[in-house]
Amino acid sequence: MTAIVDIVGREILDSRGNPTVEVDVLLEDGALGRAAVPSGASTGAHEAVELRDGDTGRYLGKGVEKAVEAVNGEIFDAIGGLDAEEQAQIDAVMIELDGTPNKARLGANAILGVSLAVAKAAAISNNLPLYRYVGGVNARTLPVPMMNIINGGAHADNPIDFQEFMILPAGAPTFAEGLRWGAEIFHTLKKGLKDAGHNTNVGDEGGFAPNLASAEAALDFVLKAIEKAGFKPGEDVFLGLDCAATEFFKDGAYHYEGEGKVRDIDAQVKYLAQLVGNYPIVTIEDGMSEDDWAGWKQLTDAIGAKCQLVGDDLFVTNVERLGRGIKEATGNAILVKVNQIGSLTETLETVELAHKSGYRAVMSHRSGETEDSTIADLAVATNCGQIKTGSLARSDRTAKYNQLLRIEQELGAQAKYAGKAALKAFA
């Protein structure tokens, strides 16, 4: 009944107008699973490879016809007829078929599209929501949203060097209330920026991208918006940063072009520690560059006891890199992006290793997204307690929040909002 009878890949557009892969998997009993693959702007050097066509005469070289051909050809030939409930086996077959360490031949975008669509088809066949199918009966924790309301770095055309300034409504009683708090702060921030003469255009992830001179200026605007919206910073709502430090790490130092400053590793650690001391910041992602392991260790020793330090480019959702981080006590949390590793099985293994080792996990979108809301279900399935899926604008972002609202409603009295517990000692 759950045998795979057809797989159809196609090229669709993501939220940036670039092509991406969408896959339909049809089972013998008529169940159809559909998944669309996201794409990142600031990508880690150690990520699985997203296969692009490179034909400059079509979509400026960003077409994904080769990946789609792999889905409809080689991949279907290899897994057609297999049982969709055998997720680990199906993912292993595709990884072996690819034959490279980073999925470069068939493309992580091809493999992931099939992997997620298989899980969705199996869930439908079992008449279960995806979060329940993947996570079992204990999947009932709604994550704290990390809402990216000011954008900088590679996500915006402004001088701010850090990529994201986030609010976390961890003090809310439910996910729905937390979302409302975030929306109210977002609109209050918009008015504050406008009144101060800044533009209120939004970046790739729906956050504002004002021309502010420094991280402190952005944090001050966010703090004011939290207070003006009627909430208490450091009690109701907390702050988070994604420095995306790899993007401005050159020749062994951190070059803040927007501020016109260069900070060596010691100065970078000192600066981040100072920000944590001055603001209610409970989480910093990629505060150091992806291969600056010594810097990461220094940062962890300096503020790891009082701040969540999330490895994105550092760990790239990869079990081996996370294993090294755990061994060296580097960072204390991992950002989980399904397309960084390229299959559902490997994603779940990474989250499991993190949780087993006392590291937190944050389910995450990419800057190039679609209307696909799979990561909302995966956040609940893995009970990871935190989700990062952009701002309170753009339907490619709100699609995930809306799915979490549905899940919370469906779970009813069983639903549990992670709240401050997700941040342990930090909040």
Curated annotation (Swiss-Prot):
Keyword Cytoplasm annotated: yes
Cofactor note text: Binds a second Mg(2+) ion via substrate during catalysis.
This protein's UniProt keywords: Cytoplasm, Glycolysis, Lyase, Magnesium, Metal-binding, Secreted
A Pfam family recorded for this sequence: Enolase_C
GO biological process: glycolytic process
GO CC list: cell surface; extracellular region; phosphopyruvate hydratase complex
CDD domains attached to this UniProt entry: enolase
Reaction(s) this enzyme catalyzes, per UniProt: (2R)-2-phosphoglycerate = phosphoenolpyruvate + H2O
Family: Belongs to the enolase family.
Protein name as annotated: Enolase
